[in-house]
Amino acid sequence: MDIVYQEITELAEIFNVQDRGEKLVADLRAREAAAREKIGSTDGKLSAVVWFSSTQVDADPYVAGKFGAPANILSALGIKNVIDSEEEWPTVGWETIAKSNPSMIVAAKLDRRRYPADDIAVKHQFLENDAVTKLMPAVKGKHVFDMDAQSMSTSLRVIEGIETLASDIAASDLNK
């Protein structure tokens, strides 16, 4: 979120509305803190993979690397991203993901239908039926959380991604 806060501050200076920029940043920081408070301390015990899409349902998925908005969402909540790639959206095989045993899978909800796995229902069906993914504790434990894909790009909507994920975790048994 720091990059978003910086951009807001810089734009507020350019347009000579620093007070409004400061107020917006303070509001976003408060929302971020409230989301963290909702799940309490994760003590480094939670991990995740963020699945954006796949060119084919059973192809290696595009997942969030260690840079970009999804990585920032996870970091804001103290969640480890199991994907350690410097690419923003690398493709990683499900066998590799399963070996890393993420506590949760965050699945992007997309309005587009460029690829079959853009459909969130198709993602869920795949996870529940694939020979590898259906055995993952995150899938078996129903810790597959949907997130609007717009929250996964660096913008003001990142805060919605943080809040959505915090609410999903709080409603689950993950951080108890």
Which residues fall in each region the model found?
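Histidine- and/or cysteine-centered catalytic micro-motif in compact active-site loops
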Residues: 51-55, 86-88, 102, 110-111
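A ligand-binding cleft/hinge motif common to bilobed small-molecule-binding domains
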Residues: 107-127
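Extracytoplasmic substrate-binding proteins
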Residues: 1-58, 83, 139-176
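Alpha-helical, coiled-coil/dimerization segments enriched in small aliphatic residues
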Residues: 60-89
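Alpha-helical scaffolding within the catalytic cores
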Residues: 34, 90-96, 126-133
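Proline-aspartate-enriched helix->loop->beta-strand connector
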Residues: 94-110
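Short, conserved catalytic or adaptor-binding loops enriched in Gly and charged residues
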Residues: 132-140
